[in-house]
């Protein structure tokens, strides 16, 4: 699984002119599921995201997690994180999971974050979404359960 994690002051997702998920201070997490991903990848990613210390402590040092600051998480599915642009000009998405598997692991990831006590909002799987955010920092982290980066 891959994720782009952004520290935000606020974020929201709009589908068909309706806000379907919104948070204040916390993390916006774009998540992509690969065709070979498993429950273990979900667990690794949920652990990493929930414990990622990218919020500043009283000394201004990045030392606190989203849970430490009582922040919120907005999770948005994004299969295009598996776009392969090494050849040609159009990305290939052959490494992305098929929709049924992608949805199941995406929903499991959200469930695992909630089990860790986090307040989680979501976008809508397979929908065309407009994502609005105020990136705080900016701080943007790339994660990959295959540890490719």
Curated annotation (Swiss-Prot):
This is D-aminoacyl-tRNA deacylase. An aminoacyl-tRNA editing enzyme that deacylates mischarged D-aminoacyl-tRNAs. Also deacylates mischarged glycyl-tRNA(Ala), protecting cells against glycine mischarging by AlaRS. Acts via tRNA-based rather than protein-based catalysis; rejects L-amino acids rather than detecting D-amino acids in the active site. By recycling D-aminoacyl-tRNA to D-amino acids and free tRNA molecules, this enzyme counteracts the toxicity associated with the formation of D-aminoacyl-tRNA entities in vivo and helps enforce protein L-homochirality. Its EC number is 3.1.1.96. It comes from Thermotoga petrophila (strain ATCC BAA-488 / DSM 13995 / JCM 10881 / RKU-1). Belongs to the DTD family. It is found in: Cytoplasm. It catalyses: glycyl-tRNA(Ala) + H2O = tRNA(Ala) + glycine + H(+); a D-aminoacyl-tRNA + H2O = a tRNA + a D-alpha-amino acid + H(+). It holds the Pfam family Tyr_Deacylase. GO terms for molecular function: D-tyrosyl-tRNA(Tyr) deacylase activity; Gly-tRNA(Ala) deacylase activity; Ser(Gly)-tRNA(Ala) hydrolase activity; tRNA binding. Keywords: Cytoplasm, Hydrolase, RNA-binding, tRNA-binding. One of its GO terms (cellular component) is cytoplasm. It comes from the Bacteria. One of its GO terms (biological process) is D-amino acid catabolic process. A motif (Gly-cisPro motif, important for rejection of L-amino acids) lies at residues 137-138. A Gly-cisPro motif from one monomer fits into the active site of the other monomer to allow specific chiral rejection of L-amino acids. Homodimer. Transmembrane segments: none annotated. PANTHER family: D-AMINOACYL-TRNA DEACYLASE 1, D-TYROSYL-TRNA TYR DEACYLASE.
């Amino acid at each position: 699984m891959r994720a782009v994690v952004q520290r935000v002051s606020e974020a929201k997702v709009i589908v068909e002119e309706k806000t379907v998920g919104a948070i204040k201070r916390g993390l916006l997490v774009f998540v992509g599921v690969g065709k070979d991903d498993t429950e273990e990848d979900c667990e690794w990613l949920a652990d990493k995201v929930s414990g990622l210390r990218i919020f500043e402590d009283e000394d201004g040092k990045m030392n606190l997690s989203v849970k430490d600051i009582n922040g919120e998480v907005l999770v948005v599915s994004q299969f295009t994180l598996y776009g392969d642009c090494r050849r040609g000009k159009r990305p290939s998405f052959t490494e992305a999971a098929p929709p049924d598997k992608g949805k199941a692991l995406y929903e499991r990831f959200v469930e695992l974050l909630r089990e860790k006590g986090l307040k989680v909002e979501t976008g809508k799987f397979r929908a065309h979404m407009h994502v609005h955010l105020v990136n705080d920092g900016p701080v943007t982290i790339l994660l990959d359960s295959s540890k490719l980066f």
